[in-house]
Curated annotation (Swiss-Prot):
Functions as an activating and costimulatory receptor involved in immunosurveillance upon binding to various cellular stress-inducible ligands displayed at the surface of autologous tumor cells and virus-infected cells. Provides both stimulatory and costimulatory innate immune responses on activated killer (NK) cells, leading to cytotoxic activity. Acts as a costimulatory receptor for T-cell receptor (TCR) in CD8(+) T-cell-mediated adaptive immune responses by amplifying T-cell activation. Stimulates perforin-mediated elimination of ligand-expressing tumor cells. InterPro entries: C-type_lectin-like, C-type_lectin-like/link_sf, CTDL_fold, NKG2D, NKR-like_CTLD. Detected in peripheral blood leukocytes, macrophages, monocytes and natural killer cells. The gene is KLRK1. GO terms for cellular component: cell surface; external side of plasma membrane. This is NKG2-D type II integral membrane protein. Homodimer; disulfide-linked. Heterohexamer composed of two subunits of KLRK1 and four subunits of HCST/DAP10. Interacts (via transmembrane domain) with HCST/DAP10 (via transmembrane domain); the interaction is required for KLRK1 NK cell surface and induces NK cell-mediated cytotoxicity. Can form disulfide-bonded heterodimer with CD94. Interacts with CEACAM1; recruits PTPN6 that dephosphorylates VAV1. It is a single-pass type II membrane protein. It comes from Sus scrofa (Pig). It comes from the Eukaryota. Keywords: Adaptive immunity, Cell membrane, Differentiation, Disulfide bond, Glycoprotein, Immunity, Innate immunity, Lectin, Membrane, Receptor, Signal-anchor, Transmembrane, Transmembrane helix.
């Protein structure tokens, strides 16, 4: 008859029991899977791979290098900006000079374009509280390379012994300049290469005035 239940069909109670059993099995599987993942992670943490170690060491060394570079850069910058300027040597000191005069070491120089006799040139320099050029030493050779023509300097020859004397009364030293006799004369012009040339004192020449700053 149609209303008689088929014994092979599962009852509702059996269906619920199967469903509960399936839920329990799924929960147990997920729990085992989670424990497995946790175990794998813990093992990886306990025994890291060589690649992981190498990468970690490389990163640490890179960070250390950057920090060291920043520290040394800061030290160098601080040293450069805070370094005291060296005090100038006395021999290189150059004080104030009059307008249109050239300052070199401890002296001021004026190169005149006027041509005068030796006495006229001397008077012109004295009117400016200076004297005709005097060579103190060959250490000034770089400066006197600028001299390209003949100029009167403060050097005259003493008739009695024919020695050369500067305006201030000091005797010419071989370490200052070398005298070259060109013609009869008791005055001298400066040429170049630390050489002085005898000249007639009445000859017209340009001249160089100088004054010490110290």
């Amino acid at each position: 008859m149609g209303w008689i239940r088929d014994r092979r069909s599962p009852s509702s109670m059996e269906i619920r029991e199967l469903h509960n059993r399936d839920v329990i099995n799924r929960g147990a599987f997920k729990s085992r899977q989670k424990r497995t993942q946790t175990l794998i992670t813990s093992k990886c943490g306990e025994n890291p791979s060589p690649f992981f170690l190498a990468r970690s060491i490389a990163i640490a060394m890179g960070i250390r290098f950057i920090v060291m570079v920043m520290i040394y850069s800061g030290m160098i910058i601080n040293l450069l900006f805070n370094q005291e300027a060296p005090s100038p040597l006395k021999e290189s000191y150059c004080g104030p000079c009059p307008k249109n005069w050239i300052c070199y070491r401890n002296s001021c120089y004026q190169f005149s374009n006027e041509s005068k006799t030796w006495l006229q040139s001397q008077a012109s320099c004295r009117s400016q509280n200076s004297s005709l050029l005097k060579i103190y030493s060959r250490e000034d050779q770089d400066f006197f390379k600028l001299v390209k023509s003949y100029h009167w300097m403060g050097l005259v020859q003493i008739p009695t012994n024919r020695s050369w004397q500067w305006e201030d009364g000091s005797i010419l030293s071989p370490n200052q300049i070398t005298m070259v006799e060109m013609q009869n004369g008791s005055c001298a012009v400066y040429g170049s290469s630390f050489k002085g040339y005898t000249e007639n004192c009445l000859t017209l020449n340009t001249y160089i005035c100088m004054k010490r700053t110290v």
